[in-house]
């Protein structure tokens, strides 16, 4: 996975810099998201792996499948990615692009998993506290996992805060073993 990210990074960075310069971050994010989804389709996977097709043929097929959903700049981007045999990296390119976009917009996607459903007031309060701590706008996604027993697990990028009962029991068990 790290190798794929390394290969995808220059393409994501170039796309991000272009989109940012032209104030098109949202549209590029949507188009790259579509490209990532199309590249993961089973039929498209076979096309991308076909040894008899040239990179130009693969790019043309890819763009044709997406129809008018791509503007000219994204079509050119797809051609460049195809010329370097990197179309299978589109999901990683799109993910990195979205990370760069979130960083530029000073926002972060936060996943909160709790043992019980959080009501809207609790979610708003948690988002406010996290926003202050992370110094970013927080987009909160809440889910439930009864196996946590109690508490919450918060994931924001590389940051993981495990305040669950299950996590505390695991730490206690580890401490008792050593």
From Swiss-Prot:
Domain of life: Bacteria
Membrane disposition: Peripheral membrane protein
Entries under Pfam families matching the protein: OSCP
InterPro entries tied to this protein: ATP_synth_OSCP/delta_N_sf (IPR026015), ATPase_OSCP/dsu (IPR000711)
Function: F(1)F(0) ATP synthase produces ATP from ADP in the presence of a proton or sodium gradient. F-type ATPases consist of two structural domains, F(1) containing the extramembraneous catalytic core and F(0) containing the membrane proton channel, linked together by a central stalk and a peripheral stalk. During catalysis, ATP synthesis in the catalytic domain of F(1) is coupled via a rotary mechanism of the central stalk subunits to proton translocation.
Protein name: ATP synthase subunit delta
Record localization: Cell inner membrane
Organism: Pseudomonas fluorescens (strain SBW25)
UniProt family annotation: Belongs to the ATPase delta chain family.
Keyword annotations of the record: ATP synthesis, Cell inner membrane, Cell membrane, CF(1), Hydrogen ion transport, Ion transport, Membrane, Transport
GO molecular function: proton-transporting ATP synthase activity, rotational mechanism
Subunit structure: F-type ATPases have 2 components, F(1) - the catalytic core - and F(0) - the membrane proton channel. F(1) has five subunits: alpha(3), beta(3), gamma(1), delta(1), epsilon(1). F(0) has three main subunits: a(1), b(2) and c(10-14). The alpha and beta chains form an alternating ring which encloses part of the gamma chain. F(1) is attached to F(0) by a central stalk formed by the gamma and epsilon chains, while a peripheral stalk is formed by the delta and b chains.
Example of a GO cellular component annotation carried by this entry: proton-transporting ATP synthase complex
Residue ranges of the TM segments: none
Predominant location: membrane
